[in-house]
Amino acid sequence: SPPAHPHVDHAKNLLRWEPWVRTSVALTELMEGLTFKASDGNPESSFALFRGGDALITLKRPPEVFFMAQLRLVQSWAELREERAAEILTQIDNQIAFQGAVTGLNATRHRWSMEWLNIGLQFAVAVEMRFKQALGCRRPVEYSAQVQPIITTPLHGTYPMGHAVQAYLVARLLQTLGGWSNDHPRTTQLQRQAQRISTNRIVAGLHFPVDATAGQVMGETLAEYFLARCGVKPIDGVKARSYVQKFKEAKGG
């Protein structure tokens, strides 16, 4: 006789599928209950991710003159390009290797952990791209041809920085996997690595410093939310974060 069907929507079905299928199913679950819209407080320049009726992440778009002022920083950091070129090229699509080096993460030994981290990264990409679309901020090279990025500038907005979102999310997830406190040496190293990955994107000429700050805010919040949806912590314990300060246009920072 043929094998009996499993129960409808049984979690054990996931073990039968390819990783990309599990990721697609997980993303559907993660995005459930989340909505995006202009912030009620400042709809002309702020955009937010809502869970129910509460804002989970709110980002304010810096004015154009602020980005112009930060061009000086982007151009000055270009001095580090020769030193960091190898890192910049490797980190285009592979951040986990750098942070995994802190924890001994191995794709063969830690297959399920790698798949779990990838689901978290795909979740981060889905959210960050919605913010980039909404806020529509131009890249450094669109303000000045003298920036001359050393790699191709991606065709999506500069703010927030996607690599920062993903780097800080991975740092938090690896900290949780390791069971390390916030002041543990490995946690500190993971945070430093996330900061360096973010800085490298500025050095490459792809981003402004403010993009990294907004990305950190988003990455840490999404990590908490992801962990809550995985049952690691209460969903109501996720801290809402915002980056809505008054930007100091004259100083560019």
Question: Where do the model's predicted regions map?
Answer:
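N-terminal transmembrane-helix/juxtamembrane module of multi-pass inner/ER membrane proteins
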Residues: S1-S113, E128-E142
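Alpha-helical transition-metal enzyme core signature, strongest for iron centers
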Residues: G120-E128
